[in-house]
């Protein structure tokens, strides 16, 4: 990972896209990679688009988060807002399923249902079939975008 990051930064681009840069790394190496990315961002002013399914990694390094579900933006906000006051039920489910010391030894909550395949017909809100708060409006029209 570090070699790839070095190769990606040698020409000092203004943007780096890091797709799952910490996947399959042990926590020590993961911390080193995150520290390196943070250093590159701060020293060179390089924008880093971090693509990850790991919210604990995202919360350590990102200023803003865009949560996607079934190819659509579910929510976008500053990281602190996403982590402390998520607005979308999918984001809430992701955060609730993070391991924590308070729940040590207990099963992690999971989001019921399944992620739709690309062939499945989707509701205007693709999360509606899995959402406990979904009502008719969720199945009839796409939720409006609003600033958070």
For each predicted feature, which ranges?
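ABC nucleotide-binding domain signature
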Residues: 4, 47-49, 124-126, 130
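Short, flexible, glycine/charge-rich loop motifs used to bind or transfer phosphoryl groups or to couple energy/partner
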Residues: 6, 39, 55, 115, ...
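P-loop NTP-binding/switch modules centered on Walker-like glycine-rich loops
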Residues: 12-21, 25-107
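Short catalytic/signature loops enriched in Gly
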Residues: 78-148
């Amino acid at each position: 990972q570090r070699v790839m990051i070095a190769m990606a930064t040698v020409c000092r681009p203004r943007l780096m896209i890091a797709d799952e840069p910490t996947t399959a790394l042990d926590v020590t190496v993961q911390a080193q990679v995150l520290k390196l990315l943070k250093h590159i961002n701060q020293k060179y002013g390089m924008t880093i688009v971090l693509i990850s399914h790991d919210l604990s990694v995202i919360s350590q390094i990102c200023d803003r988060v865009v949560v996607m579900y079934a190819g659509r933006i579910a929510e976008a906000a500053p990281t602190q807002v996403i982590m402390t006051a998520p607005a979308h039920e999918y984001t809430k489910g992701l955060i609730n399923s993070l391991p924590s010391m308070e729940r040590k030894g207990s099963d992690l909550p999971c989001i019921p249902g399944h992620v739709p395949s690309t062939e499945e017909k989707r509701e205007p809100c693709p999360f509606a079939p899995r959402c406990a708060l979904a009502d008719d409006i969720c199945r009839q029209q796409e939720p409006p975008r609003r600033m958070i």
